[in-house]
């Protein structure tokens, strides 16, 4: 399976001719983005998915600590941000830039590559999605781009090729980064946006082009986006009040779901996909090259569900400035180039990362939605004590 960099560059450049102004006016195309990533010398490639930080400037210290600790302990080859990276309601360009810098500067300092898509909250202010992507592109660590212009309000749909550890010109895996939009502008059904028909057609064309350039052999892949696909309800198992782990009132009646047998993770939160479907999952399913589809959006869910041969995966939120649970954390996804028909993934929570760290645990108690007001008051004073102790321990007499 071999696709040279030269062939891939020509493929990307030709596809860029389809681009228009709304995205391209602000940001780089895929052909201009530095996306040359290889499996490591052990034949592995580890992705760190960070979802729903949803903070501003300044970012909460506890969230920053989570991100730094995750990078230091998990040693990822790529960080993937899956939207609601910031709280977009501030609506000022300087606020957007400084909010994005709060986490992008961390990745820059660690020297870890980053790809990103936006969520429904990122651009709720006056700054467009294209303008935000342009901010990301100012960082050397960013390997994403605005991608092809789809003729609508989305921006940041592209792909990131991964190359063999032994051959820098052999593309053996692909990562689809899809902008799932924000709120429904297509019809009167309300709710969240669905991936558009134009994006789906772009995917089909891009996938066919990559397959042809790869000698007719499809390239295995992942897909990352913010909002889960509507098929999640087909993948889940209907339940009742006693067996359901999540519920919502739909058309005046309570509806319950639970994870199907064999699924991993938890489902405490009722999923929030679009109310309509443009056929995204079917397109990925029909092409048969997608191992897993990874989402954020529903902050408390951590499920992994096999559905029609594709694993649907939700990653919990990483931000303490928005609603959260004891599962707040990140997700690791590890590939081995010797068998690209499967992968390993796990959620790494804040509590996992900082077990035994008294100061970090006090900071968690101070910021977590899971703790009472009294616990937060006690945690504040505990954190002060631990902080003073740490300062004293580091002071050189």
PLM-predicted stretches and their roles:
Residues 4-26:
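Sec-dependent N-terminal signal peptides of Gram-positive bacterial secreted proteins and lipoproteins
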Residues 59-62, 83-105, 122-141, 235, ...:
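Metal-dependent catalytic neighborhoods of phosphoester/phosphodiester hydrolases
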Residues 56-58, 87-90, 116-128, 183-186, ...:
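Active-site environment of divalent metal-dependent phosphoester hydrolases
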Residues 20-33, 395-397:
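Sec-dependent signal peptide cleavage junction
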Residues 74-78, 174-176, 189-298, 302:
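His/acidic metal-ligating clusters that form di-metal
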């Amino acid at each position: 399976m071999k696709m040279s960099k030269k062939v891939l560059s020509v493929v990307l450049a030709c596809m860029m001719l389809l681009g228009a102004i709304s995205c391209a006016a602000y940001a780089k195309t895929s052909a201009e983005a530095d996306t040359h990533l290889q499996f490591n010398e052990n034949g592995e490639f580890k992705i760190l998915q960070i979802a729903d930080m949803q903070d501003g400037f300044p970012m909460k210290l506890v969230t920053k600590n989570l991100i730094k600790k995750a990078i230091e302990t998990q040693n990822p080859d790529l960080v993937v941000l899956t939207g609601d990276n910031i709280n977009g309601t501030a609506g000022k360009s300087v606020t957007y830039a400084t909010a994005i810098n709060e986490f992008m500067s961390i990745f820059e300092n660690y020297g870890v590559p980053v790809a990103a898509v936006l969520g429904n909250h990122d651009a709720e202010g006056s700054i467009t999605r294209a303008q935000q992507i342009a901010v990301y592109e100012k960082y050397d660590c960013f390997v994403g781009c605005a991608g092809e212009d789809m003729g609508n309000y989305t921006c940041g749909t592209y792909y990131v090729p991964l190359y063999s550890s032994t051959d820098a010109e052999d593309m053996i895996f692909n990562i689809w980064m899809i902008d799932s939009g924000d709120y429904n502008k297509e019809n009167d059904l309300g709710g969240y946006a669905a991936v558009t028909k134009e994006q789906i057609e772009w995917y089909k064309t891009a996938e066919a082009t990559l397959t042809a350039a790869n000698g007719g052999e499809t390239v295995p892949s992942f897909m990352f986006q913010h909002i889960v696909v509507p098929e999640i309800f087909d993948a889940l198992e209907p339940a009742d009040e006693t067996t359901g782990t999540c519920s919502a009132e739909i058309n005046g009646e309570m509806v319950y779901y639970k994870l199907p047998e064999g699924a991993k993770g938890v489902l405490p939160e009722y999923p929030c996909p679009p109310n309509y479907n443009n056929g995204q999952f079917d397109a990925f399913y029909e092409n048969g090259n997608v191992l897993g589809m990874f989402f954020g959006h529903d902050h408390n869910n951590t499920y992994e569900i096999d559905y029609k041969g594709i694993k649907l995966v939700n990653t919990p939120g990483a931000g303490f400035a928005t609603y959260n649970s004891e599962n707040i954390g990140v997700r690791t996804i590890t590939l081995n180039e010797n068998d690209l028909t499967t992968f390993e993934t796990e959620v790494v929570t804040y509590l996992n990362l900082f077990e035994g760290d008294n100061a970090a645990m006090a900071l968690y108690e101070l910021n977590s939605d899971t703790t009472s007001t009294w616990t937060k008051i006690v945690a504040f004073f505990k954190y002060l004590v631990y902080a003073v102790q740490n300062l004293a321990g580091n002071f050189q007499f």
